[in-house]
């Protein structure tokens, strides 16, 4: 996929860069695997805001994705590749030899008409899904399970992938795109290839209205609020906050580790890279 720019008829079109989706399926989604979804606007059942800066946006129907690759040792044919408004990756509609259809995360270089398979008998080929112990080291994989039978959890967004580094007993050693190296049970399932739509990281929104279409509302700075609303609020004239950056509830917003200790910590070999701040 290529990037698409626009002639500068307006200030917003001058800045806008989007992904060219002209090669994707132009019809509607497959109805038996599609359902409606309610938009909460960031409110809970009491009507109170629990997630700020959410609301509005275009209506989307939810596509039911098979993260488990349940149909083992049955060959499937790729019918079409579609845009999914609920995720950055593209999805592929596949038909199995028993005429059952399902949506899967579409990897790069997967084309309409390709044959894919899941299970022990599958080849090491893009789109095929196998247990990690059956995949050779150095292979790029995506949609990887953390617990056997729980469905793919890792590397599902556009352009992401995991490198299978090797094995240590009953565990496979994975190098994640974040820089983290961790062990995962080698009976977990992963899919060969890199997730589609790698140009997603290069898009430019261009104007505030496009964020509103996506259901994102404006974000007010803490220093522009009153002291009753934010720790940085108040002051005479323009002030810089007077303290280290914090959230509206007083929690440090710069570098504080918020992940609680878990039993799975012992499986993490190397932590992810620190962001530059």
Tell what function each PLM region has.
Residues 99-111:
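Beta-strand/loop nucleic-acid-binding surfaces
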Residues 86, 94-96:
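Structural recognition of beta-strand segments within beta-rich domains
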Residues 1-87, 112-277:
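Basic, glycine/proline-rich low-complexity segments that contact nucleic acids
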Residues 96-99, 177-178:
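Short acidic-glycine loop/turn motifs at beta-strand connectors
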Residues 92-93, 172:
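Short, hydrophobic/aromatic-rich beta-strand segments within well-structured domains
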């Amino acid at each position: 996929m290529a990037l698409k720019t626009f002639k500068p008829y307006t200030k917003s079109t001058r800045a806008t860069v989007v992904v060219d989706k002209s090669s994707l399926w132009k019809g509607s989604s497959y109805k038996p695997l599609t359902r409606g979804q309610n938009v909460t606007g960031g409110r809970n059942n009491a009507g109170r805001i629990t997630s700020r800066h959410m609301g509005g946006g275009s209506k989307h129907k939810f596509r039911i994705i098979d993260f488990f690759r349940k149909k083992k040792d049955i060959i499937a044919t790729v019918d079409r590749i579609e845009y999914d408004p609920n995720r950055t990756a593209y999805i592929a509609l596949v038909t199995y030899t028993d005429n059952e259809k399902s949506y899967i995360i579409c990897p790069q270089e997967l084309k309409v008409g390709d044959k894919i398979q899941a299970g022990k008998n599958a080849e090491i080929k893009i789109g095929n899904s196998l247990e990690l112990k059956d995949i050779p080291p150095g292979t790029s994989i995506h949609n990887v399970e953390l617990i056997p039978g729980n469905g793919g959890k890792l590397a599902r967004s556009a352009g992401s992938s995991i490198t299978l580094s090797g094995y240590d007993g009953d565990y496979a050693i994975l190098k994640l795109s974040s820089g983290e190296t961790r062990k995962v049970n080698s009976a977990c399932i992963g899919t060969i290839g890199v997730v589609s739509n790698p140009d997603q990281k290069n898009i430019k929104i261009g104007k505030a209205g496009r964020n509103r279409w996506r259901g994102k509302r404006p974000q007010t700075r803490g220093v522009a609020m009153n002291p009753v609303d934010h720790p940085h609020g108040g002051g005479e004239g323009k002030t810089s906050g007077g303290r280290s950056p914090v959230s509206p509830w007083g929690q440090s917003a710069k570098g504080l580790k918020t992940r609680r200790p878990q039993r799975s910590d012992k499986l993490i070999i190397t932590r992810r890279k620190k962001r530059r701040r």
